[in-house]
Amino acid sequence: MANGSGKPKPAFFIAVLVVVAGLVGIAFYRWNAKKAETAQSVGSGKIDMGSIKQQAGGGSGSSQAENPDPNSITTVKEYAFEPASRLPEVPGTADYAALGKPRVVKFAVNVWAGWAPIIWANQGSKPKKMWKDGKGGEFQVELVLADNPVDMGNTFAAGKVHIGWATVDMLPLVVNRMSRDPRTMPRVFQQIDWSNGGDGIVVRESIKSVSDLRGKNVVLAQNSPSHYFLLNMLLNGGVQPSEVHMDFTKDAFQAAAAFNQDKKYSAVVSWSPDIYNLTKTGMGNRMLVSTQTANRLIADVWFARADFARDNPEIIEGLVRGILEADEDLKTDASKQAVGKLMDEFYSLPAGPGLTMLGDAHWTNYAENRDFFLNQNNPTNFERTYNTAFLLYKAIRSVDTKVPFDQIMDFSVIKKLGSEPRFAEQKNEYEFKFTPTTGLDVNVESAVLTKTVTINFFPNSFDLHKQIPAKSGTGEVPYDPNVDYTIEEIAKLAGQFGAARIQISGHTDASMRGVADESLVRELSTRRANAVKEELVNKYKMNPNQFVVAGYGWDKPADPKDPDNHAKNRRVEIKVVPAEAQ
């Protein structure tokens, strides 16, 4: 493409420019795509807890903020699939220690109150008592103490124990290690308990809220329930993990010792009894939050090797049934005294601590297990807890590839036992009993667990779903388009923090200051707060006594530096206040 003088024609330069522009465009596109990928990749940029919660909620990959399912989140909607249709096939011959004659199942546990039911069912740790399997055959159980989860995992993978223990938040880490051999992949059959005060964050007296941990040193055990607990508290409180300096120890007990010895640590995440020893009078420490408040956050479960579960379904049924029956037996004081002594002996404790630690966990009965495994709409079910843990650990680069929840969760035995009246008639007993209170009774400002959630209102309105003319001129749109999502998020928080008060405070703008009657202004703000409470109680069947409602009129602008921002001031604020502050 040249003219008579041998020089390129103008069209040549145009073509070159087009090619160069195209190459630059491709490079720019790929750079932006890489940048976006990096921003969303694990461990880089800010971690968005709201996004994690949306993805964890039984997600289908939809870009919608809410599940289009018309049922409310507390409506019982059970999974329609059968576990066998989702669980991967287990190839090859078994690779675990032979059971022998009589059959002896080796069941790993750690030093924890949650294992009281199986210790009671087995009458100690030794294989003495005869259990009945699903077909009436006999077997025995040997409880193996394995406190270190890494060592326990190695023993489990080697086939030296048939049953392992974990909290659901640990499972993404467990399956990440076990996925190389499908025979060792965990099959989770039963929830043992909810941590109910046994895990906690202890801080120095100067730390008043989660946000005060910014820039501070925290000591804890890495990739443990303590780690998951802290990540949840930080992100729900609006603090990025990168804003906190974390030092890791081998286990929670070493973390407590480090906190006690070194004043550079402003907080420690540990568990009972250390969290209570550290908060004794005169030590200068306090409990920021424990699973007494976040009482549906840490769930203990047991799991079998996939090859063992394949070969011994009747033993699995016998274990589930025996533990559930022991839950019922342990409701008497006499049985609690007796199991406390068995725990002292098994855990090599002096006389007494076994009984004392029983209150650290709530043993889950049949109804609570069914709700945990089968109720798709339960905001704190197995699926959501597992997915949330995976996404949190992926965000800090502890895991990469996800194993779907339904490839490790097997609710077949729980579902089968529902045909027996003694189980089917059980009720969920894990409900916190709130006493009515007022906004002035709760010290909200001193200890708020989560960042403040806000809903905005139209002038002179307390209608949550107020419609206004669309800017396009056609039809109407919600004044606050996020209100339904916000209400659902509050319901999820209230579920996780089952023993926390939910403070709902209503506010107005000050545009009529000096003109309007102040009592009318305060009444409007109170009505706004009550509208939020009523929506939660009516839509999600929540305990009305969990909510503390107050109307502040125009006394508390959203931003004291910008008190005349009327649109921001017409609002309701929702805060989660721990039981420890009540």
Residues covered by each model-derived region:
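Periplasmic OmpA-like peptidoglycan-binding domain that tethers envelope proteins to the cell wall
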Residues: 507-582
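N-terminal hydrophobic or amphipathic helices and topogenic motifs
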Residues: 2-151, 157, 365-447
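Short, glycine-/small- and polar/acidic-enriched structural segments
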Residues: 45-48, 64-251, 266-272, 288-290, ...
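Pocket-lining segment of extracytoplasmic ligand-binding domains
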Residues: 168-170, 178-179, 242-247, 252-351
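Secondary-structure end/capping motifs
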Residues: 310-401
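Solvent-exposed, polar/charged alpha-helical surfaces in well-ordered, non-transmembrane soluble domains
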Residues: 116, 120, 150, 154, ...
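Periplasmic peptidoglycan-binding/anchoring modules of Gram-negative envelope and division proteins
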Residues: 446, 457, 463-506, 533-537, ...
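Second-shell loop/turn segments in exported
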Residues: 105-106, 142, 215-220, 264, ...
